[in-house]
Amino acid sequence: MSKSENLYSAARELIPGGVNSPVRAFTGVGGTPLFIEKADGAYLYDVDGKAYIDYVGSWGPMVLGHNHPAIRNAVIEAAERGLSFGAPTEMEVKMAQLVTELVPTMDMVRMVNSGTEATMSAIRLARGFTGRDKIIKFEGCYHGHADCLLVKAGSGALTLGQPNSPGVPADFAKHTLTCTYNDLASVRAAFEQYPQEIACIIVEPVAGNMNCVPPLPEFLPGLRALCDEFGALLIIDEVMTGFRVALAGAQDYYGVVPDLTCLGKIIGGGMPVGAFGGRRDVMDALAPTGPVYQAGTLSGNPIAMAAGFACLNEVAQPGVHETLDELTTRLAEGLREAAEEAGIPLVVNHVGGMFGIFFTDAESVTCYQDVMACDVERFKRFFHMMLDEGVYLAPSAFEAGFMSVAHSMEDINNTIDAARRVFAKL
């Protein structure tokens, strides 16, 4: 047995499923998950000594690559002054200034510890601000594991085949209206059925939890218009897309102005950080200035803030997003060409530093129904064969891939060459 197999066997006796987040268990692809010893740049190294070109990037945060010296040094320096104080710090102020400068639609920001906390808190705030209970989300989109959001959810919930999680009371779920991504008619129908009851729409501007599904040109502006028409707030969940699709996020890339924005992943540089913010009048409704309660023992802790501040300063440097786009475009084009040479039907979506691989005869993948029609069994075989080639992709047909600026063009070309060999045998 390999060391990963031994560790996984021991872990399953102590941790549910042997992992602390379901998708890591390789449930979506089968087999034994890799246990990682270390990571550096674009590479992961497992406990058995094998190296992999990494396109998971800790599920998105590692846009600069693993073990970036600026982030590592910032964490070490902050840790020497103490780990957590439960009191305000200067770094919290500096971090808030930087985030609101980089994302101009955020007049104010509140730091939390995860993307789930950010979306959960933003929805509570929207409900409190509007005095309404119902929310709209989209089929296949995932916004964390808060009860009201595990309704027709994406990400690990799709991988497990459970879009509706047990343990979510029907009384909670009844306030969540689920519409079809990229289908404005379904959203208008929901508003017309409940014209005075919907507090907000929450949307991934690029649906990255049913793999990678970009919005159609009219979709996000249409959501903005419907929110304005019916008096609801628009929450853009940029936990995955923030600072990755563009410096100011997908909202800037697609030219749409939300009322609230949720952030995570890159904002922490690898540490557990989330944030939500937006219009000043809405944020003023949040405690302690307003009646909507939200709190967190470790929110804004100095280690996480130092990591996030260092990361965002690096991400804001000229050329970062151009490099991400160039590398991702080359990978997407190369995978398409290699699949076509082998006669394998493949769609590769990509936006900025995100991409998605779909085995399908369809010409495009634009919604949940398109994703569910893809050949998951073929993806499973592709995943394991690429793993044997030293390429680590997301272990699920329903998860996006992530590029970093630490990837070289040689890494990309080696990945395409590996895919060409795999497609020939697939």
Swiss-Prot record:
Its main location: cytoplasm. Keywords: Cytoplasm, Isomerase, Porphyrin biosynthesis, Pyridoxal phosphate. It comes from the Bacteria. One of its GO terms (molecular function) is glutamate-1-semialdehyde 2,1-aminomutase activity. One of its GO terms (cellular component) is cytoplasm. Signal peptide: none annotated. The modification N6-(pyridoxal phosphate)lysine is found at residue 265. It holds the Pfam family Aminotran_3. Its EC number is 5.4.3.8. It is found in: Cytoplasm. It catalyses: (S)-4-amino-5-oxopentanoate = 5-aminolevulinate. One of its GO terms (biological process) is protoporphyrinogen IX biosynthetic process. Disulfide bonds: none annotated. It is an enzyme of class 5 (isomerase). Homodimer. NCBIfam families: hemL, PRK00062.1. This is Glutamate-1-semialdehyde 2,1-aminomutase. The gene is hemL.
